[in-house]
Amino acid sequence: MTSQEKVPLQVQLSLPQILSRRDWENPQITQYHRLEAHPPFHSWRDVESAQKDRPSPQQQTLNGLWSFSYFTQPEAVPEHWVRCDLAEAKPLPVPANWQLHGYDAPIYTNIQYPIPVNPPRVPDLNPTGCYSRDFTLEPSWLASGKTRIIFDGVSSAFYLWCNGQWVGYSQDSRLPAEFDLTPYLQAGSNRIAVLVLRWSDGSYLEDQDMWRMSGIFRDVKLLHKPEIHLRDIHIMTHLSPEFTSANLEVMAAVNIPSLQLNDPQVTGSYQLRVQLWLADKLVASLQQPLGTQAIDERGPYTDRTQLVLRIDQPLLWSAEQPTLYRAVVSLLNHQQELIEAEAYDVGFRQVAIHQGLLKINGKAVLIRGVNRHEHHPQTGQAIDEESLLQDILLMKQHNFNAVRCSHYPNHPLWYRLCDRYGLYVVDEANIETHGMQPMSRLSDDPSWFSAFSERVTRMVQRDRNHPCIIIWSLGNESGHGATHDALYRWIKTNDPTRPVQYEGGGANTLATDILCPMYARVDEDQPFPAVPKWSIKKWIGLPNESRPLILCEYAHAMGNSFGGFARYWQAFRQYPRLQGGFIWDWVDQSLTHHNDHGQPYWAYGGDFGDTPNDRQFCMNGLVFPDRSPHPSLYEAQCAQQFFQFSLLSTTPLVINITSEYLFRESDNEQLYWRIMLEGESVLEGSQPLNLSPESSQCYRLAEKLPTLNKPGQLWLNVEIRQPKETPWSPAQHRSAWHQWRLPQPLFSPSSDLTNATAHYAPQLQHNLQLQHDLQLQQDEQHIKVTYQQQCWQFSRQTGRLAQWWVADKPMLLRPLQDQFVRAPLDNDIGISEATHIDPNAWVERWKKAGMYQLQQRCLSLHVDHLSHSVQISAEYGYEFEQEPLLHSHWVYRFDRHGRMTIDVNVRIATSLPAPARIGMCCQLADISPTVEWLGLGPHENYPDRQLAAQYGHWSLPLEQMHTAYIFPSENGLRCNTHTLNYGRWTLTGDFHFGISRYSTQQLMVTSHQHLLEPEEGTWLNIDGFHMGVGGDDSWSPSVHIDDILTRETYQYQICWQYKV
C-alpha cells in the first residue's frame, strides 16, 4: 500500500487551507482525528514490569528542547514551516508556557475574559507558537504495531503535522490529545510540528481565576501499541455491606480490525487475564475470552469482556490508610502468549451518600479540603513531580485529607500520588464561563453542547480508575443550564460509584448530589436575588433538603486573612450534615518576574503589562509561591487536627482525647504534656497514645498541680507527635496540640500596673527634686522628667512624649502617639475586580470618615507631683473637616524604678466607622537582632485568628516578626502579650504588638513586598485593641461582629522600661 493510500485525504490540505476553516472559532469542532479518551497506557510486554510499575520501553518521551517560532497571528506563519524550521526559530523547553520565556505576556484575570466577549469568535491577533522537533525511530519500532503521540496538556488549541503531513487538531487545555502517527512515520529521523493558538472558542470555557498562559505545558510522549491492543479499561470495586469481601470488576475493550469483529472464532481466540497483587503477593487471578457476556438478544460485544474477581477480607483504601493493590490486565493470543499488559493501582473503597451523609467505606467523612491550582512561580503551569509531591506532603502534614482540582483535570501523575499518599480528590471538568452574562449563556446553548460534553466525559474516561477520586465536578461558575443536567445524568449512568457535585446555579440544583456552596457563612444569610446563599446551618434545614453540605470554596485566604476560620469547624463538628469544605486556596499564584536590575520578585496581575488584570487577587494561598507557609496554614492545621481535647479536672489533672480518624489506629502517636508557669515548664511528661478510630480515652497526667515557689499563671500544654517517620512526614511530626489556662493560679500575681493610692504633694514647683533622684523640669516648650541616666521629654505644643533620652542618647526617632489605622488588608479593600470599588468596604468607609487624614490637637496637658512619682496627663482630639471623631486621654506615670506607665482612654464618635485599632506607635532608634515576648505565638496571630497560637515565652529574629505578604499590608501582630523584650526595652501589660523595620505608612503606599525599604531604627506598634482580619470572603466586609471595635470607649495600660 502506498503512503498516499494510507494517509487520509485531509492531511493533503495546505497550511493556509487548514487555517482558513478557523476551526478554533467553531464550538462544534473540538478535534480532528484525536483518539478516544482512556486511562493512561504503558503497553508493557511482560507482566512483571507491569506489576512493579517499571518504565515501559514502549514509551519515548519527547520532552526537552524544541524549535520555536512566535507569531502574532496564525496567518503569519509561513507555509513551509510545517516541513522545516524557520531561520529565526529558537530553542524552547517543553513542557513550558511560552510567556515565561520572553514571548507574549501572561495575563491574570479573575472573572473578566482577557479577550472581547464575542463567542465563538476570538481576536484576529491571536498569538501563535510554532513548535517542532526531530526524533529518531529504529526500524524495529515500526516493524509492527501502532505508534501514538500523546500531548498531556496544550493551551488552548493546536494543529499537528508529522513529516510535513497534517495529522489532526485538538482543543481543551487540560486533557490529553492523542493521535495515531503510524501512517506518517519512517525509520530514522522524523519531524513533528505543532501550531499552538493562544485563543480559541475553548477559551470561553476556560475562564478560571488564574494566569492565562499558553503553550505545550505538559508532557509529550510516544507510545507503541501492538496491532491488536487494549483500547479501554474500567476498574471498579464493590464492597459487601459488612466490608468483609469485595468484587473487583474489570471491563476491558480490545482494538480489533473491524473486518474481524463479527467473526467469533477470531475474537474468541483473544483472552483477557486480570491478576491482582498486594505488593509481591498474587491475591487473585481470572482469565476469560472476549465476547462472553450477552448484552441483548443479538449477543455480546465481541471486542469486550467483563471480569469479576472476588476478594475476601480486602484491605480498604482511604486517605488515612491508602492501601493499594495492583491490577495487571493482560491481553493474550490464542496460544496464551502475552500481547501486552496494562496495570493500575487499585483501592478497595466505597463512596456513597446515605441518610444525608457522604460516606467512605460506611463512615461519614469530614472533608478537610483545599482548592489547588497547578502553579509554580518559575515554570507557571508546567509542574514536575517534585512540585506535585511537595504539595501533597505539605497538605498531609497540615491535616488536609482532600483536595479539589480547581478548576480542571490535573496532570495525570497528581492522581497517582494522591492514590499512594492518601488524599480524597474532587476531579473537576475544565469548564468555567464566569465572565458570561448570564453565566449560563453557553451551557444553555445547544451549539456548545459538544464542547461541554467532551470536557466532562473525557475527564471521567481518563481518571475513573483512581480510588482517590471520590467526587466528580461538572466545572465551576458556569451558571446552570440544560447541558449540566444532561452531563450529570451521563456521569450517573456511566459511573454510578461516585457522587457528582456542581455549585453553579445556586449550589442546590438537580445537577448536584451535594450542597456545595461557595463562601456561604456559618450564621449569616446572603439573600442575593437569583441565587441566595443561606447560612450553612440554615441551608441543611431547608424544607425537603436532605443532601450533605460541603463547601466547594470557603475561607478566602487572601493575604493577611483567614479570620473566623475556627467558627466553621465548630459548626462542622456540631452538625453532622455539615461535612467540611475546601479552603480557597492552596498557593499564592504569583510568578517570578525581574526588575530593571535583573533581580527576581514575585509578580501579580498587571506586572507584565497585562490588560485587563485583577492585580493581586491571584494571591489567595495558604502558602507562598515557594510553598513556605502563611500563618493561616497553621490555623488550618490546628482547626482540622484529627485529635480533639477536653480538660476534665485539675485535681487530679485529667484530660480526654478523642480520635477523629475513621479507620486508623493511633499506633504512631505520643502524647506530650507540660504545665507552664508564665512560659516556663514546671512539670511535664509523655505517654503513648493508643486510640481506636472514633474513640475517646481519658489520660491522668498528674495527681495535683505542682507547688510553686513564685507567683504566676499556670497553663497546660498538650501535643501529639508521631515518633516514627511516615511516607508523608518526618519523625516527631506534631499533628495536634491544645492549651488550657488552668482555672486558678496558686498565687495572685503582683502587678506593676495597679494604680496605687495617689498622695498629691503640695503645689508643684519648677526643678523640684523628688525621692530617689526623680527630677522634674519645666519650661515654656518642654516638660522633662529625669531619673538617673534617663530623661523623658514632652512637647508642650503637641502634648506628646517627644524624646526618651538615655545617657544623652535619643531613643526615639518618632514620638509616641495614638494609632487608629492599619495598612489596609485585602479584606479591608474589599474588591474582587480592579475596576470595582465597594463603598461598603472598610477602607472606603475609613477614607470617607477621614481616618487617614486626622488632624490632631493637644486639648490639655497637666503635670502632677505624687509622693513617689510624677504624673503627666494629656488629652488629644482628632478631627476631620472640623468634625471631632476621636478623643484620647493619656496618663503617664514615672516612678522611682525608672518606669513609665501609660493609661490610655479613647472615646469614639458615634458617627465614625469602627476603627482598625486602638493603640500607639513610635519609631525606636534601636535595632536589636531578637524579639522576645510572653504572649501568643510564635507565629503571627490576630483576634479572630489565634486558634493555633499558644501562650508562652517566644523568641524570634526581628526579620521574622514581619510577614512578607506579596501585597504589603498590616502584618506581624502578636496578641495577648504580657511582656515584650526588645534589646534593652521591656514592656508589660496586656496588649498586642507588631514590630518591624517598616512603618504603617510605607506599607500603605507600597505595591509589592520587594519594594519595601527597611527604615531607620525599628517601628513598634502597641495595640490595646485590634479589629479582626476577616476572611469568609475578600470582597465584602467579613469581620465578625465580635471582632469589630464597636464600643464608644476603650481603655488599656502599658508599662515601659529601658534597662540602662
Swiss-Prot record:
Active-site feature positions: E477, E553
Classification lineage: Bacteria, Pseudomonadati, Pseudomonadota, Gammaproteobacteria, Enterobacterales
Species of the source: Yersinia pestis (strain Pestoides F)
GO molecular function annotation: beta-galactosidase activity; carbohydrate binding; magnesium ion binding
Site feature Transition state stabilizer, where: H373, H407
Coiled coil, from the record: none
Annotated signal sequence range: none
Family annotation (PROSITE patterns): GLYCOSYL_HYDROL_F2_1, GLYCOSYL_HYDROL_F2_2
Xref: InterPro entries: B-gal_small/dom_5, Bact_Beta-galactosidase, Beta-gal/glucu_dom_sf, Gal_mutarotase_sf_dom, Galactose-bd-like_sf, GH-type_carb-bd, Glyco_hydro_2, Glyco_hydro_2_AS
Pfam families: Bgal_small_N (PF02929), Glyco_hydro_2 (PF00703), Glyco_hydro_2_C (PF02836), Glyco_hydro_2_N (PF02837), LacZ_4 (PF16353)
UniProt-annotated binding residues for Mg(2+) 2: N613
Full protein name: Beta-galactosidase
Disulfide bonds: none
Enzyme class at the top of the EC tree: hydrolase
GO biological process, one term: lactose catabolic process
Binding site for Na(+): D209, F617, N620
EC number in record: 3.2.1.23
CC cofactor note: Binds 2 magnesium ions per monomer. Binds 1 sodium ion per monomer.
Binding site for Mg(2+) 1: E432, H434, E477
Family: Belongs to the glycosyl hydrolase 2 family.
SMART domains (alphabetical): Bgal_small_N (SM01038)
